[in-house]
Amino acid sequence: MKPRTPNALLAIAMAGISTLALADDGNGQGNKPCGIPDATVARVQQQLAAVATQNNGGLFSPSRMWSAVVDRQGVLCSVIRLGDAWPGSRAISIAKANTANAFSNDALALSTANLYAPTQPGGSLYGLNNSNPFNPDYLAQGSGIGRVPGGIITFGGGVPLYLDGKVIGGLGLSGDTACADHVIAYRMRRLAGLDKDLKGVATDGTDNIIFANGTPAGFQHPHCGDSDIVP
């Protein structure tokens, strides 16, 4: 893929606009059907248990996570918990899934890690975090399935889901450092086969995390710690 400048890429993006037991945290109370087939959602979420046992460069081993999937309309399809993940990370995982879906299109994939630098003061997307606020009605555990909770998070852990080169939704992970959350989400999506034919801002043409050596610029993300890895 021929390298593109950050400004050119942004123009494209904005134009299109056991201890390892998995617990389902939804009761199906919503009235909007998920636009992703149930089998596909299940295939994504089933990857969490295996990925959590890998070295993901985070604070916990095995990982303790919330994992959320939204469809292209932002409808919450599924949110699950692995281990004693931080309760506050439930809403964050949903918001990450929403962000990755909301700001990716068929021309350009942007993970939430890619959005870190552009949304800092002076960045071309500064203020984005004030858009699409999370609906507090869905903060409670067990709520939000079949609804559109919204939310914007611009640090690692959210990736768009692609099928045949088209965005079908987003996946959000939260429960560790933002860098580890990204690794887990990225690996889950790859194992589920929903990372095909996407076009991203990383040098390899993906939406992988781009670590900054100094102050993050372009589509970079700061390091979270000495154990950080690139999946």
Regions found by a protein language model. Give the residues of each.
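Long, compositionally biased tandem-repeat segments
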Residues: A13-M14
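Flexible, solvent-exposed loop/hinge segments and secondary-structure transition points
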Residues: D24-P231
